[in-house]
């Protein structure tokens, strides 16, 4: 969510990534949905709204919006804000992120093409920047996926897994999840026994810019993204493919 400080507050969702995980085949498919996607959510009474606005009505509402869009049941969620994002990455000792662009975010860091080792604040700046790119929000979405992939790779490494309880203690209160601690422990134990790396694929749906009123702004037109439904259908196929492996 697009706030610092207390993670429990209701706020707009800044990044919306659906992770489809098959623990048997060690395959993860990430689906990124732009925050300005113009879709319905459970609280919008059939009126379209920005996906980011869904979070104003609770995390369950954001989950419902993505479930409706992709026709899939979401079993668990992880919710964090900017502060928690920075804290988690710092607790892991930083992450290694590949950049396909050379750019600078003042006054944080200059990012070079190739692998960049990033602290929490540097990873956040990398994930949020869009003005440096001709593709704008599309490139930002791709960079956000790269950060998530780097986080998954670091979290599934032996160095972190062997110390996962210390890592969790260090980031307590920086994120919210409905996954029980026993379920987290089971996943950690399984990964320690079979340290095969996960294959991680990513896909971002896009759309066309438009100006429309929304459920949350009924009297004011705002910039939205009309979904490319062919890409949404392709994303559905990717999701079902991983689940059926």
Regions found by a protein language model. Give the residues of each.
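Non-catalytic, solvent-exposed segments at the cell envelope interface
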Residues: 1-245
């Amino acid at each position: 969510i697009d706030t610092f400080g207390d993670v429990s507050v209701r706020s707009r969702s800044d990044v919306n990534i659906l992770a489809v995980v098959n623990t048997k085949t060690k395959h993860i498919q990430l689906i990124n949905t732009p925050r300005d996607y113009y879709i319905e959510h459970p609280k919008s009474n059939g009126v379209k709204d920005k996906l980011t606005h869904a979070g104003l009505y609770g995390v369950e509402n954001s989950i419902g919006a993505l479930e409706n869009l992709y026709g899939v049941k979401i079993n668990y969620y992880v919710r964090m804000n900017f502060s928690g994002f920075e804290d988690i990455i710092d607790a892991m000792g930083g992450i290694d992120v590949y950049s396909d662009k050379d750019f600078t975010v003042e006054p944080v860091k200059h990012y070079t093409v190739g692998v960049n080792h990033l602290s929490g604040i540097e990873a956040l700046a990398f994930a949020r920047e869009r003005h440096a790119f001709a593709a704008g929000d599309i490139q930002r979405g791709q960079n956000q996926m790269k950060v998530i992939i780097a986080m998954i790779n670091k979290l599934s490494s032996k160095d972190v897994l062997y110390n996962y309880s210390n890592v969790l203690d260090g980031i307590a209160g920086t994120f919210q999840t409905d996954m029980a601690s026993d379920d987290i422990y089971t996943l950690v134990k399984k990964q320690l026994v079979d340290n095969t790396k996960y294959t991680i694929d990513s896909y971002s749906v896009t759309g066309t810019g438009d100006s429309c009123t929304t459920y949350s702004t009924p009297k004011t037109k705002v910039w939205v993204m009309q979904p490319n439904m062919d890409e949404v259908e392709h994303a559905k196929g990717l999701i079902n493919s991983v689940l059926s492996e």
